[in-house]
Amino acid sequence: MNLVIDIGNTKVKAAVFELDTIKVAYVFDEVNFFEELEYILEKHEITHCILSSVKETREDYLQELQKIPFFILLDATTKVPLKNLYSTPTTLGIDRIALAAAAVSLYPQKNSLIIDAGTCITYDFINLKSEYLGGAISPGIDVRYQSLHHY
């Protein structure tokens, strides 16, 4: 089975896949990373894992995940099925690259607008030639809600 882990600004999201089907998904605080990972690995026969993180990835996380037979750390050097035309490609968040790669895989040869509403709201555009053209980032729903009540 495959394990996909995303370390975001606020939460860690993980999902166990069998082929293209999500078997189970987990959401937890990063402080519980090792306990949750141990639980997932005990419960499922994980043979492949990919990790993306909006933060610098901790070395102890990598050491633990590299025990999985096939492990990939998604970063700016990972080959993805799109051409990144962003003006400063090394500053583009890895979470946004992951979403763009997913859009290209799910909707090949189509223009795609990806909207992700998490701690921040991001908007990213991929054209029908699988070229990432850029996007925008703005405060998330919670910050917007707080701002409405504050001002």
List each model region and its residues.
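Catalytic beta-strand/loop module used to bind and position nucleotide/cofactor moieties
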Residues: 124
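Nucleotide/phosphate-binding catalytic cleft detector across ATP-hydrolyzing
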Residues: 1-9, 15, 22-112, 127-151
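Divalent metal-binding pocket/active-site signature
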Residues: 115
